[in-house]
Amino acid sequence: MTEPFEGRVALVTGAGRGIGRAVALELSAGGAQVALLARSLSQLDEAAEAVRAHGGNAVVLQADVGDPTAVAEAAAQAEKELGPVDILINNAATVQPMGPTVTAPSAAWASAFAVNVDAPFHFAQAVLPSMLDRGWGRIVNVSSGIAAHPGAMVGMNAYAATKSALEAHTVNLAAELAGSGVTVNVYRPGSVDTAMQGWIRSQPPEEIGAVLHEHFRVSYEEGSLITPKHSARSMLAQLLRDETGEIWTVGDA
């Protein structure tokens, strides 16, 4: 029986841990060769070893997605080592700055857009030419439920703004590429038990806002968070469909 991603090359950003790592492992289990990209080399090496331990093929790309030059170089390296990218999962993200907007550093705000919005754009630019030449490609931009309800989590203005912008970019790009064989979709992964969630819970309530801190604390203590593997499988169950410009959620699969 042929695996669903047999013969495909996938590039996953934010692949060192959490959802990105889980997606990379599931793609590999489905037959894909995977390029793992993140900032932490130690996390990337561990993720790559996990892929190889199950018979998969992985290459490690250490890069800061907020740097357009690094993005272009990483995408080129992925193609050099594995071949043209068929599947792009833009998962890397930052939740900072958090807390009152009036005290948010301008540099941190700009960095949030560089990582959460600009990087997916630059990665798409890098891989689209070969996808369009071959008439097949899959791009998934990982968003958040905050884009559906931007006012729901006070204290996360930058995250709400960037994820909303990412979804608009995704849907518009999908319309631009309609009929090309390349699909572009949004994935809202649900509330997942990740290091990012743990970091938020570790922050002083007075710095990020007591209500926001309580939201994340209660979600964790009530056991309502899902595993990265659960979320990854939900995403990939929808990946090979021909629909484009959609907003997937963890419950759609």
Region locations from a protein language model:
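The beta1-alpha1 cofactor-binding region of Rossmann-like NAD(H)/NADP(H)-dependent oxidoreductases
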Residues: S42, Q62-E73, S106
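C-terminal helical subdomain
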Residues: G179-V182, V186, T194, P205-A253
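Substrate-binding pocket helix/loop in short-chain dehydrogenase/reductase
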Residues: G99-T101, A108-A110
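Conserved glycine-rich Rossmann-like NAD(P)H-binding loop of the short-chain dehydrogenase/reductase
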Residues: A32-E46
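Conserved glycine-rich cofactor-binding loop
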Residues: V9, G16-R17
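Catalytic loop of short-chain dehydrogenase/reductase
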Residues: V140-A165, T170-V171, A175-G179, S191
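A short, exposed helix-loop element centered on a Lys and neighboring polar residues
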Residues: A124-Q125, V171
